[in-house]
Design a protein with these regions (language model features):
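RNase III-family endoribonuclease catalytic core
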Residues: 1-108
Length: 108
């Protein structure tokens, strides 16, 4: 890891009780095929969708379901996540295998 995990906690404004969980969430399968972030990513995608949906529901109480769905899709997608990851310099914290380049997280 190029930078330490405590500096990442400061950037995102969250102090983890279990830093091993944070470390796992930052571990790409190329670094550790058995203990990596894939299952946490699955769970995180659902949590992110729920949190954003709840906020959209509160912010736009008169919008129809289809309009809320379009807003959700514009906020929760790979392109937006890549933008946020790059803004946070996530590539400085992700653990990848020797054959994987994490110099920039790209929208692929």
């Amino acid at each position: 890891m190029k930078k330490n995990i405590n500096s990442f906690e400061k950037i995102i404004g969250i102090k983890f009780n279990n830093q091993n969980l944070l470390l796992q969430s930052l571990t790409h399968k190329s670094n550790n095929p058995l203990n990596n972030n894939e299952k946490l990513e699955f769970l995180g995608d659902r949590v992110l969708g729920l949190v954003i949906s709840k906020n959209l529901y509160k912010l736009f109480p008169k919008d129809k379901e289809g309009d809320l769905d379009k807003k959700l899709a514009s906020l929760v997608n790979k392109k937006r996540c890549v933008e946020i990851s790059n803004y946070l310099s996530l590539e400085d914290y992700v653990l990848v295998g020797d054959n994987k380049d994490n110099s920039k997280i790209e929208n692929k």
